[in-house]
């Protein structure tokens, strides 16, 4: 069984999270400049087995795609071309940044660390992945 990778793609930075080998727990892996994500993922899959990429689906409250969704779709097209052997799925990422900030606050991180946008992106990827895992658990 391979890992599941979650990707919180942004125009500047991208948060990445991965499951454990049993696909039960999500952990933050890295925040990568968005132009380097596909290379980072290619390197990652050369070291670790990966079964699936889960990409944050950017939607507005009315369920319409957000303005940034076009960048996410372009990234996913590039990812699928570069790594065609691993399927890609989307998962709703609404409120993940808010939840990430809340988790950081509740975790007692100092203000300077909470302002680290890269850390917010990585935690957002963890939240996307954990929510995806929870949704699959209840479909069994």
Curated annotation (Swiss-Prot):
Protein location: Cytoplasm
Top-tier EC class: hydrolase
Keywords of the record: Cytoplasm, Hydrolase, Nuclease, Ribosome biogenesis
EC number(s) stated in the UniProt entry for this protein: 3.1.-.-
Q: Give any single GO term for biological process.
A: rRNA 5'-end processing
Classification via InterPro entries: RNaseH-like_sf, YqgF, YqgF/RNaseH-like_dom, YqgF/RNaseH-like_dom_sf
Chief place of localization: cytoplasm
Q: Name one GO molecular function term.
A: nuclease activity
Gene Ontology cellular-component terms listed: cytosol
Query: What biological function has been recorded for the protein in this entry?
Result: Could be a nuclease involved in processing of the 5'-end of pre-16S rRNA.
Q: Which family does it belong to?
A: Belongs to the YqgF nuclease family.
What is the protein name for this chain? Putative pre-16S rRNA nuclease
